[in-house]
C-alpha cells in the first residue's frame, strides 16, 4: 500500500506537466497553473479568447475603411481613373497608365479592334461554309490582347465621363480593374502567373511585342485579300473585253439585259449568236436547277425585282445560277489559264467556256447544302459587277445593288492609308532604327548594320565605380558628381575602339585591323522610351530577395526637353518633351513598388475620343468581351468572377485567400489596405458599384445585338441621364472643358489613387539632390 501512493504521485507529477504544456500552447499569454488545471475555466476562457480575437479581426477592417477617409477621398477625387492592384500588379498598372496617355495609342488600338471585329465576323461566316478546326483559334488568340486593351480603354473612358456627369454617385475611389488584360498576359506569357513582382520594362516589351505580331498578322491577311480581290477584277475585266462589241451595239431599251449578260459566262452569249437551239436547251436545264434554289434566293431576287427590271421570269433565273458559278471561279487556280485561252481566238473559246460553265453547274448540283453562302457570294459578285458597269460605262446598274457598294469601295480606298498606319502602330510610335557603324583605321572604310529598337537602355553611373567596389569588402555609396541624361545617352552611343584580341576583320584589307565602332540614331520614333539601368549585379550575401540585382539609387539629372541631334546620322530639328515617368521605390528588382507620373497634355485628342464616346458606349461595348468559346460562356462580369484568383477556378478558394493571405500579398505590390485587394472578389467591376447609366447600357448591350434594341437602349440611357443625344454631346464638351483644368499638370498614378503633383515637387523627385529609394526607371519623351 505505501508503495502505491508514490506511484500515483509520480503519475500525477508526470501527467500534470503534459497538461500544462498542452494548455499553455493555447494560452501562452496566461500561464497560471490554476486555470491550466481547471478544465471548465479553460473552456470558458477559450470561448472568450476566440470571441475577443474575432472582435479584433472585425475591428481591423472598418478601421481601414473609416468614414473620414472616405469623405476625404470624395473631396479629393480627381476625374482620372486609376487601376486596382490585383496582387502585385503595380508594374502593369503603371505601364497601362502611360500607354493610355500616349498620343496616338488609343486611336491605333481602336482601329485595330475594328479590323479584328470585322475579321471575327468573317470567320463566323467561314465557319458556316467550312469547318477549319484549330486554324481559327490561333488568330483569335493573337487578337485577344488588342480586344483586352480596347475593353479597358472603353471602361476607363466611360468611368471618367460618367464621374464628370454624375460626381455625387461616386462614394469610393475612381478606379477600374485590368483583370481581362492581366489574364491575357498570363496566357501569352506564363511568367506572369501568380502574384510575384515583375519588371515594368519587361511587361512593356511584352505588350508592344504582341501588338506588333498582331499587326503583322493582320497585314498579311489584308495583303492576301487584296491579291484575291485584284485577281477577281482582272478576270472580270478580261470577260468584259470579250463582250465589249456586243454590249456597245445594244439599244437603250435593253440596258438591263446587258447587265445580265455580263453576269453570265461570256461564251454562252457568243454561243447564242452562233445558234439559238443550244441556248434553249441550256435555259431549260438552268430553269430546272434553279427551282430547288428558289426559296433560298428570294432575298436576292427581291432586290432585283425592286429595281424595276422588265425581264421575264426565265431570264431572271439564268443569271443567278451562273453568277453563282462566277463566285466560285476566283477560288480555282485554273480559271486564269482558261481565260488566257479565251484571248487569242474569237469563236472557238466560246465552246470551251460552254463546257466550263456546264462543269461548274454540275458542281453546284452536288453542293446543295450550302445555298446561303452561295447567296452571299452572289450578292457580292452582283455588287462588284454593278460598280464595274458604272465605271466602264457599259450600262447603269440597278439602284438596289449599286448605291451601297460604291460607298464601301470608297471607304476601302479612303481607309487604306489609315489601315496601313494602324498596322504599323508600334513602328510609328515606339520603334526606331539604330546604325552600328564600324570604321577601319587603316583603309578608313565604313560598314553599317541597322537594328530596330523600342527603348534605349542607358547607365546611371560609370562602370569604373563597380570595379572599385568589387575590390573593396565594404561598398559605400559612391560620391561622384551629378550625372545628366545627356551623359547617359553619350555612354550608350559612345565610340568604342576595337583593339587587341578583339580586332575587326576588314573585308577591304583582308586581315584583322583596329577599328572604331559607334552607335547612331538613324530613324527616331514618335515616342522615345529611355530605360535607366538602376539595377546592377551584386555578390552580397544578404541580397537574397533580388536575385543578385540590387538597386542603384544614384540620382540622374533629367531634363524636360531632349534633343538627339548630336547622336543622329543626319541633321534634324526634332525635339522631344517628357510626358511620362515610371518610378520605382525599393531596394531590389523583385520587390518595391511602381508608380507612374503623367503630364496631361493634348486634350484635343481626348476630345476626339469623347466625340466617339456615344458610339462606343452604344455599339462597341459588348463586342470585345466574348472572344472564343471559353469566354463566350458568360458576360464580362462572370468572366471576372471566374478567373479572379487562379487557385482552382472556383469562388471559394478566392475567398479563403482573401481572408488569410491579403497582408502577405499586398506588401510587395503596394496595396495600402485590405480593401484594395478585396475589391477583386467583392466587386468585379467598379462601374457596377457606382451604377451609372453608362454601365447599365453596357450590361444590357452584351446580351442583345439588334440595331432596333440598341436604339431603344440609347433612348433609355438618355432618359436616365435626363438628356437626349444632343444633350449628351453637350455633356461631352463639358467633360472636355472640365478636364482642361488639369492641362499641363502632372498626375501621380499610384494604382487606384490619383493625385496632382506640382511641377516643382515632380522635378525634385525626378532629379533629387540626395539618393532616395524612389528613383525614375522609365522615361517617356514624345516628339514636340
Curated annotation (Swiss-Prot):
The active site is at 90 (nucleophile), 593 (proton acceptor). Residues 232-243, 252-264 have a biased composition (Basic and acidic residues). One of its GO terms (cellular component) is nucleoplasm. Interacts with FANCD2 and PCNA. Interacts with WDR48. Interacts with ATAD5; the interaction regulates USP1-mediated PCNA deubiquitination. Keywords: Autocatalytic cleavage, DNA damage, DNA repair, Hydrolase, Nucleus, Phosphoprotein, Protease, Thiol protease, Ubl conjugation, Ubl conjugation pathway. It is found in: Nucleus. Autocatalytic cleavage of USP1 following UV irradiation inactivates it, leading to an increase in ubiquitinated PCNA, recruitment of POLH and translesion synthesis. Belongs to the peptidase C19 family. GO terms for molecular function: cysteine-type deubiquitinase activity; cysteine-type endopeptidase activity; peptidase activity. It holds the Pfam family UCH. This is Ubiquitin carboxyl-terminal hydrolase 1. Negative regulator of DNA damage repair which specifically deubiquitinates monoubiquitinated FANCD2. Also involved in PCNA-mediated translesion synthesis (TLS) by deubiquitinating monoubiquitinated PCNA. Has almost no deubiquitinating activity by itself and requires the interaction with WDR48 to have a high activity. Residues 81-784 form the USP domain. Its EC number is 3.4.19.12. It comes from Rattus norvegicus. The modification Phosphoserine is found at residues 16, 42, 67, 475, 767. GO terms for biological process: DNA repair; monoubiquitinated protein deubiquitination; positive regulation of receptor signaling pathway via JAK-STAT; protein deubiquitination; proteolysis; regulation of DNA repair; regulation of protein stability; response to UV. The record marks 670-671 as: Cleavage. CDD domains: Peptidase_C19O. It comes from the Eukaryota. Residues 1-21, 33-54, 232-341, 363-411, 686-723 are annotated as: Disordered. It catalyses: Thiol-dependent hydrolysis of ester, thioester, amide, peptide and isopeptide bonds formed by the C-terminal Gly of ubiquitin (a 76-residue protein attached to proteins as an intracellular targeting signal). Residues 7-16, 389-407, 694-709 have a biased composition (Polar residues). PROSITE patterns: USP_1, USP_2, USP_3. It is an enzyme of class 3 (hydrolase). The keyword NAD does not apply.
